[in-house]
Each structure stands twice: as C-alpha cells, then as structure tokens.
C-alpha cells in the first residue's frame, strides 16, 4: 500500500512540476 502511495506522489510531482514552471513562465511573460 505504501508503494502505491509513493508511486502516486511521485507521479503527481512529475506532472505538477512542469505545470508550475510553465505557469511561472506565463506569469513572467505577461508582466
């Protein structure tokens, strides 16, 4: 069960990471 939680958290980090960076770049570009 812990392995599944670790995999899902890792997947969230892998997906959310680039999204947050893209949002930051968009905000800087709009300014």
Curated annotation (Swiss-Prot):
The keyword Chloroplast applies. The chain crosses the membrane at residues 5-25. It is found in: Plastid, Chloroplast thylakoid membrane. The keyword Cytoplasm does not apply. Keywords: Chloroplast, Membrane, Photosynthesis, Photosystem II, Plastid, Thylakoid, Transmembrane, Transmembrane helix. InterPro entries: PSII_Ycf12_core-subunit (IPR010284). PSII is composed of 1 copy each of membrane proteins PsbA, PsbB, PsbC, PsbD, PsbE, PsbF, PsbH, PsbI, PsbJ, PsbK, PsbL, PsbM, PsbT, PsbX, PsbY, PsbZ, Psb30/Ycf12, peripheral proteins of the oxygen-evolving complex and a large number of cofactors. It forms dimeric complexes. A core subunit of photosystem II (PSII), probably helps stabilize the reaction center. Belongs to the Psb30/Ycf12 family. This is Photosystem II reaction center protein Psb30. It comes from Phacus acuminatus.
């Amino acid at each position: 069960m812990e392995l599944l939680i670790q995999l899902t958290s890792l997947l969230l980090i892998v997906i959310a990471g680039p999204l947050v960076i893209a949002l930051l770049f968009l905000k800087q570009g709009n300014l």
